[in-house]
Every structure is written in structure tokens, then in C-alpha cells.
């Protein structure tokens, strides 16, 4: 247990960027229990609102990127909590099946006992008649991220699905590289493992100008038994 990371932690976030050339900025604040893997965040669009695209494509960069709030089961070293007080960064490319591409660069730091996130995002090639630009998405299904050590950090891959108005899904693939600001020689790296995520929107108002979302995340090994004794 990292003494700098308490059982209840506050967080603050500033996100800015563009989607199909449209500029915007969001801020958020929240709290949660990093050791139980639960967190709640309240997010406001402070520039460029109401957004002309679905807020859902931003949602995963607020909380699916809030990696300090993951419960790690026994035997899995916590790469993210070990990174403090220096913190960590991550870069992600999300490719949607309709051709849209969403890239994120995020920095996580610890300031006066509060986790502070700065995110730069860029979305391109989202079809004007697609679910994202028509704002016809209805939230993310739960998913599992696959993680393993790579290039001195962690590499994450996952397939995700957005619910769409009228039934059906818009699927996408995530590829994320996580890097600690601390040299990896100073802590224990995890091996191959998975993280289950459930990201839910609890509240929204004013045409998605204000959103409250909650996430529960747990790191684990494969649940299936191995004949070779592997985890």
C-alpha cells in the first residue's frame, strides 16, 4: 500500500481538444476508493457546449484513464499506485468500426493529496451520419482490458462496445501505452493480467453539459484453471 494513496482520494481533471475540428474544453472533479476500484466523477463542458457529438466518446478518457482507482487482486503488483509521488502518463488510440479515430494523451500527478489529470484529445473521421456525430449512443458495455509489460511500461488492449439508439452497437478497439514517471527499476512490474471495467453514467443534464459517471475496476488473472499451473 502506497502511503500517499489513501483509501479515499479526490481527483480533478482538465480535458481539451477537438472532434472533427470542433474545439471544446471540459473540467471535472470527483472522489473514490483506489483500493476498492470505485470512483465517481462530475464533469462539466466549460467551452464549446453543447457538444455536437456524443459525450460517450469522451467518457472513457475521464475514468477508463483514471487508473489509480483499480482494485488489484492478490499477486498483481499495482503499477499505477507504485508510480507516485511522480505519477504516470498514458497515450491511447481508439479506432471505431465506422472509421472514427480518437487519440488521447494524458498526464496524472499528485498535488496536495489530490489526483490531477490533464488530457489532450483529438477525434477525426467520424461520419456525419454516424452514431457519434448524430448523438445516438447510449453508454458503454462492461469490458476487459488485457495488460502486459512493454517498452518499460504497460501496454493495454481492449475491444469495447457502445450501445446505439434503436438497438445494436458501435464497436471499437483500444490500444494504450502506460508509462510511469518513476524509473521501473524502483518498483515491481506486474506480469500479464486483465482489468474488468464497468463504466456507467449516473446522471446528465443540460444537453450533456453536465454528466456524472461511476466506474468499478478490478485487476485479476484469468479465472479459468490451467493444466500447466499458470496464473
UniProtKB/Swiss-Prot annotation:
<keyword id="KW-0157">Chromophore</keyword>
<dbReference type="GO" id="GO:0008218">
    <property type="term" value="P:bioluminescence"/>
</dbReference>
<feature type="modified residue" description="(E)-2,3-didehydrotyrosine">
    <location>
        <position position="64"/>
    </location>
</feature>
<protein>
    <recommendedName>
        <fullName>Red fluorescent protein eqFP611</fullName>
    </recommendedName>
</protein>
<dbReference type="Pfam" id="PF01353">
    <property type="entry name" value="GFP"/>
</dbReference>
<keyword id="KW-0455">Luminescence</keyword>
<dbReference type="InterPro" id="IPR011584">
    <property type="entry name" value="GFP-related"/>
</dbReference>
<comment type="similarity">
    <text>Belongs to the GFP family.</text>
</comment>
<feature type="cross-link" description="2-iminomethyl-5-imidazolinone (Met-Gly)">
    <location>
        <begin position="63"/>
        <end position="65"/>
    </location>
</feature>
<comment type="function">
    <text>Pigment protein.</text>
</comment>
<dbReference type="InterPro" id="IPR009017">
    <property type="entry name" value="GFP"/>
</dbReference>
<comment type="subunit">
    <text>Monomer.</text>
</comment>
<keyword id="KW-0599">Photoprotein</keyword>
Amino acid at each position: 500500500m502506497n502511503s500517499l494513496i489513501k483509501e479515499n482520494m479526490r481527483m480533478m481533471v482538465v480535458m481539451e481538444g477537438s472532434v472533427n475540428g470542433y474545439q471544446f474544453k471540459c473540467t471535472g472533479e470527483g472522489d473514490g476508493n483506489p483500493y476498492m476500484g470505485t470512483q465517481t466523477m462530475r464533469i462539466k463542458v466549460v467551452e464549446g457546449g453543447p457538444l455536437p457529438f456524443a459525450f460517450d466518446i469522451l467518457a472513457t478518457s475521464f475514468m477508463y484513464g483514471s487508473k489509480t482507482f483499480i482494485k488489484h487482486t492478490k499477486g498483481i503488483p499495482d503499477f499505477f499506485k507504485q508510480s507516485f509521488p511522480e505519477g504516470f502518463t498514458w497515450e491511447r488510440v481508439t479506432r471505431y468500426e465506422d472509421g472514427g479515430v480518437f487519440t488521447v494523451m494524458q498526464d496524472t500527478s499528485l498535488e496536495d493529496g489530490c489526483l490531477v489529470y490533464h488530457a489532450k484529445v483529438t477525434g477525426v473521421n467520424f461520419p456525419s451520419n454516424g452514431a457519434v456525430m448524430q448523438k445516438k449512443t447510449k453508454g458503454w458495455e462492461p469490458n476487459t482490458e488485457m495488460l502486459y509489460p512493454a517498452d518499460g511500461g504497460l501496454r493495454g488492449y481492449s475491444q469495447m462496445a457502445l450501445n446505439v439508439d434503436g438497438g445494436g452497437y458501435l464497436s471499437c478497439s483500444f490500444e494504450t501505452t502506460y508509462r510511469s514517471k518513476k524509473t521501473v527499476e524502483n518498483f515491481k512490474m506486474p506480469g500479464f493480467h486483465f482489468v474488468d471495467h464497468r463504466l456507467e453514467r449516473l446522471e446528465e443534464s443540460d444537453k450533456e453539459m453536465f454528466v456524472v459517471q461511476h466506474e468499478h475496476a478490478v485487476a485479476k488473472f484469468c479465472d479459468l484453471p490451467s493444466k500447466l499451473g499458470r496464473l
